[in-house]
Amino acid sequence: MKKQLDQLTAYTPGLSPESLKKQYGIKGELHKLASNENVYGPSPKVKTAIQSHLDELYYYPESGSPKLREAISQQLNVDASRILFGAGLDEVILMISRAVLSPGDKIITSESTFGQYYHNAIVESADVIQVPLKDGGFDLDGMLQQIDNKTSLIWLCNPNNPTGTYFSHDELFNFLKRVPSDIPVLIDEAYVEFVTADDFPDTLKLQEDFDNAFLLRTFSKAYGLAGLRVGYVIASEDAIEKWNIIRPPFNVTRISEYAAIAALEDQEYLKEVTQKNSFERDKFYQIPQSQHFLPSQANFVFVKTSRSQALYDALLNVGCITRLFPNGVRITIGLPEQNNKMIEVLKHFEY
């Protein structure tokens, strides 16, 4: 057994509504707003696509998801040979880490970001440098100072999970200019569809100038397919060719591929979802207590408090399950009535 596994624990999902009801003695309805899921669900066309292909379940998937790859290639205007799929971004991160990292290599990322960058690096016996956040966001200058000849991967998350903060196009451009061209920079844009900031990076455009800038996206968030597990990376052809060696041959299911294609094609529904999210997100920042909230470009709000357990409990008491952190609570943007209840709690909470 790998000794480095002693440094890790298995992922612990949040308690189910049923478990929390029993633990806290809650009798009313509980809403799961802890995992940044799209509360509006996927496009209705997804259900139609799934139902129309149920008679294919006894077939293996087409390896590499060629239909979906071509659909994304057409929509984003990138060569299909530069796209690789995983069963969610979790698997994409695992494949890249496994393909690139050797014992003694180093990755650079941030504190308080998506945990799978750290987790998979430790599994591969790599060292992890976690640069503290600056004003709730990635400290890109601080990360540059950590680069040395052992650095093999740099992981960025934009907007960042769990804080919702982002760095701009110019900030990313200036960062990439200063990173040695042989070090891959992985830019995780899982929440990009929710972004409304005008200066958010056009990462696809930046890839034209920086061969080491690799982009990760997912169907789990805005597209509402978290239960079907489809994520992908857009990178250089050489990198994709190598990483594809690591990919399990049938990792994305046949049904997942059809569902993702249907979701991708319904851009009008996606626009409706993201507009609703933006409207509801803004409501949180219209109250005076928003001084305690980190500015978010995602479908969640991070609330800073030294009394995070008390805030978690207060939100639970109005029927909303959120995500507890030592320094705050992350609230997934819910339906209007759920958000209104949480905002009332936030208005009267002593931070």
UniProtKB/Swiss-Prot annotation:
Signal peptide range in chain numbering: none
First-level EC class: transferase
Organism: Staphylococcus epidermidis (strain ATCC 35984 / DSM 28319 / BCRC 17069 / CCUG 31568 / BM 3577 / RP62A)
Annotated protein name in UniProt: Histidinol-phosphate aminotransferase
Recorded superkingdom: Bacteria
Record EC number: 2.6.1.9
Similarity comment: family membership: Belongs to the class-II pyridoxal-phosphate-dependent aminotransferase family. Histidinol-phosphate aminotransferase subfamily.
Gene3D superfamilies according to UniProt: Aspartate Aminotransferase, domain 1, Type I PLP-dependent aspartate aminotransferase-like (Major domain)
Cofactor(s) the record lists: pyridoxal 5'-phosphate
SUPFAM superfamilies on file: PLP-dependent transferases (SSF53383)
GO molecular function ontology, one term from the record: pyridoxal phosphate binding
List of residues that carry N6-(pyridoxal phosphate)lysine: 221
